[in-house]
Regions:
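Active-site metal-binding motif and surrounding structural segment of the metallo-beta-lactamase
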Residues: 43, 54-99
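Metallo-beta-lactamase
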Residues: 4-8, 100-148, 200-203
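Short, charged N-terminal beta->alpha structural module
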Residues: 249-271
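Short acidic active-site motifs
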Residues: 85, 284-288
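Active-site neighborhood of phospho(di)ester-bond hydrolases with catalytic His/Asp-centered motifs
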Residues: 48-50, 70-78, 98-101, 159-162, ...
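Active-site-proximal loop/helix segment associated with metal-binding centers of metalloenzymes
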Residues: 144-148, 164-196, 237-242
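FMN-binding flavodoxin-like domain, especially the glycine-rich phosphate-binding loop
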Residues: 171, 181-216, 221-222, 263-276, ...
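Conserved beta-strand hairpin/beta-sheet module of binuclear metal-dependent hydrolase folds
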Residues: 3-65, 150-153, 157-160, 257
Length: 391
């Protein structure tokens, strides 16, 4: 990636990873990603975050091309896709100081073995004067990790927001040119990474609303010249508002649960409810996570394997529980051959959800006409609950 000018004193010196398809050995990356790092030039020069260690060579080449001496590295976040090249930068610039907060210092020392004497510690509201330019540090715990912070370039009104407001999107565009292009990756990123911290994010959005910000420069994806484009979407996603939607992760072994799912989908459609089914044997978990951002209800469908739920259903329940979406209702449908505790175990897997659990539907063998009536009753109950929310 070439060096790109953000403002008169800010340069993007990070890396685009066009080929990466999995993050944290967990999150699919259908659109690749980028690791954004920024140089702020003045009498002193600051490097804001670094890049994934697989791309260290690109970062170092960009710094050499700019012909700068790095006086300060600002570490907004300790995760290695942003901090992993810090050791190489410290090695290249021996007098460089590593500027971060106390919690981030601890993590960086533990994860990257950085010597304590390299650190310069800042707290919320502290500033670093580079010359004519001033960096202000804003603590943002649990917008992602407990040590996350933002850096604000006062004179040019640039917010370096780290992972917050980012998107896993490999693009040659420095700035968002078409919101339609970035909406899906940004929402997917929020769903997979940020949604568990919804309550904390609300507070940090209020902080940003009180600031004069002209450019949002995240650590992944393109930058925003109109910050309200991305903050407005986040305000919607973190609100308590839900939509007339049911998310339906399912798996079926011999067709019984699939027959229930197909009937349930039809019953929901007949009642004017949007349904989003995900066959867990092939589903993209990022798409499943995205669907949970807005939905009022989630229903997991599973057969019984030995005495418990199918492992794919367990994974779906664990994912829903970990992401803690704002859905209001949940239920379980499925089948069994001779017994088991499928429903009970799935319930236990979703204890983080602050939802009303609607009566599950569990059938023995292939569903009968009476079983389909029970599924219709569940669809009726969901319709009623959604109407009570004016959906």
């Amino acid at each position: 990636m070439s060096i790109r000018k953000v403002t008169s004193s800010v340069f993007q010196v990070g890396s685009i990873d066009w080929d990466r398809r999995l993050f944290d050995e967990l999150i699919p990356l259908p659109d690749g990603t980028s690791y954004n790092a920024y140089v702020v030039k003045d009498e002193k020069t600051a490097l804001i975050d670094t890049v994934d260690p697989t791309k260290t060579h690109e970062l170092m080449a960009h710094l050499a091309h700019l012909n700068v001496s790095i006086d300060f590295i600002i570490s907004n976040h300790a995760e290695q896709d942003h901090s992993g090249s810090i050791p190489a930068v410290l090695e290249a610039f021996h007098d460089c100081r590593l500027v971060t907060n106390p919690k981030c210092k601890t993590l960086l020392m533990e994860m990257l073995s950085i010597p304590e004497e390299k650190f310069m510690i800042v707290e919320d509201g502290d500033t670093l004067v580079l010359g004519e330019k001033t960096l202000e540090f804003i603590m943002a715990p649990w917008v992602h990790w407990p040590e996350t912070m933002f850096t604000y370039l006062r004179e040019e009104k640039v917010l370096f927001s780290c992972d917050f407001l980012g998107a896993h999107l490999a693009t040659s565009d420095l700035f968002v040119e078409d919101m339609a292009t970035v909406y899906h990756p940004a929402k997917r990123y929020y769903a997979e990474i940020m949604m568990p911290f919804r309550t904390s994010i609300r507070k940090h959005l209020q902080t940003l609303a009180s600031m004069d910000i002209e450019i949002v420069a995240p650590s992944h994806g393109p930058l925003y010249k109109t910050p309200s484009l991305i903050t407005g979407m986040y305000e919607e996603w973190v609100s308590d508002a839900v939509k007339n939607e049911v998310v339906l992760p399912f798996v079926s072994m011999h067709g019984s649960t699939r027959a229930m799912v197909d009937h349930f989908i039809g019953a929901l459609i007949d009642r004017g409810i949007t349904v989003k089914p995900f066959n867990l044997t092939t589903a993209d978990i990022g798409e499943l996570a995205m669907s949970l951002v807005d939905a009022a209800t989630v229903v997991i469908a599973s057969p019984t394997v030995l005495t418990g739920p199918h492992p794919h259903a367990v994974y779906a329940a664990y994912l829903v529980n970990a992401l803690r979406p704002k859905c209001r209702f949940a239920s379980i449908i499925g089948s069994y051959g001779w017994g088991g505790k499928m429903v009970e175990l799935l319930k236990q897997s979703m204890q983080n959800l602050n939802v009303e659990l609607l009566k599950p539907v569990l059938v023995k063998g292939h569903p009968t006409a009476e079983d389909y009536k029970l599924i219709d009753e569940l669809a009726n109950e969901i319709y009623k609950k959604h109407k009570e929310l004016n959906l």
